[in-house]
């Protein structure tokens, strides 16, 4: 009712999980507002399990998360991928490496996202960590990227994050280094119910691909390196 009173003719409810970087949506949402100002766009930050339930229950029209393991009745389409980097505090001994071997990373404590709040991110990181025969030492599990990088900056632990997340944080005390070898990628997926989309949703999905294709590519070498 309030949306109609404000002059909106349609609504698009978008769920975000796994700490999806808000800057990824700036160009997309700006384009939506320019093309269809009559569409009321609502964003909801929720855990992945809640997003999936909400999509099934028609609480959300579409969502973004870092997992394609969403069960029956939900479609997961890759939207974009981000190179994984190691977030390292300034003046840390690992900064002698331009590309850090994963087994060297695991010699130090890690700060991770809460697996309940960042389920998809946690699954992708767990798969990467299983590629070496070393048990990670998890110093802390946190609810936000900001707190994760604050702990890194303070020297408590290292973290594994997407390069665009690290670039967006603008913290001079946190330096990004790619992993040695072929850099793993963190993939973000667009999730929606496996039904014919509404015209409004269909136009939104059509906008995602060109926005993502035209987005700057964050290669590991472009990741912020300060005082190194």
Task: Please name every model-derived segment.
Residues 72-78, 82-83, 97, 146-195:
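Beta-alpha-beta core module
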Residues 24, 175-218:
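A late-sequence structural motif
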Residues 9-72, 142:
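Central regulatory/effector-binding core of bacterial HTH transcription factors
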Residues 47-52, 56-60, 65, 116-175:
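Hydrophobic hinge/microswitch elements
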Residues 110-132, 198-206, 215-216, 220:
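Secondary-structure junction motif
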Residues 11-15, 63, 87, 111, ...:
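Short, well-ordered beta-strand segments
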Residues 6, 74-84, 88-110, 193-194, ...:
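Flexible hinge/capping segments at coil-to-helix
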Residues 1-5:
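Alpha-helical linker/hinge and terminal dimerization helices associated
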């Amino acid at each position: 009712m309030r949306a109609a009173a404000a002059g909106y003719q349609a609504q698009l409810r978008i769920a975000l999980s796994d700490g999806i970087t808000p800057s990824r949506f700036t160009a997309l949402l700006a384009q939506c507002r320019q093309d269809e100002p009559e569409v009321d766009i609502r964003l909801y930050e929720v855990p992945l399990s809640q997003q999936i339930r909400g999509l099934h229950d028609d609480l959300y029209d579409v969502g973004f998360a870092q997992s394609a393991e969403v069960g029956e009745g939900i479609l997961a389409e890759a939207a974009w991928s981000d190179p994984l980097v190691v977030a390292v505090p300034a003046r840390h001994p690992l900064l002698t490496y331009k590309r850090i071997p994963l087994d060297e990373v695991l010699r130090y404590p890690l700060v991770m996202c809460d697996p309940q709040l960042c389920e998809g991110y946690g699954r992708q990181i767990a798969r990467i960590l299983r590629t070496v025969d070393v048990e990670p030492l998890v110093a802390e599990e946190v609810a936000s990227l900001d707190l994760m990088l604050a702990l890194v900056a303070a020297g408590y632990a290292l973290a594994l994050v997407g390069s665009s997340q690290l670039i967006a944080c603008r913290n001079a005390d946190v330096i990004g280094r790619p992993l040695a070898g072929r850099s793993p990628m963190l993939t973000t997926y667009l999730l929606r119910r496996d039904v014919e989309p509404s015209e409004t949703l269909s136009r939104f999905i059509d906008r995602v691909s060109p926005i993502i294709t035209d987005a700057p590519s964050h290669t590991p070498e472009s990741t912020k390196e300060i005082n190194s």
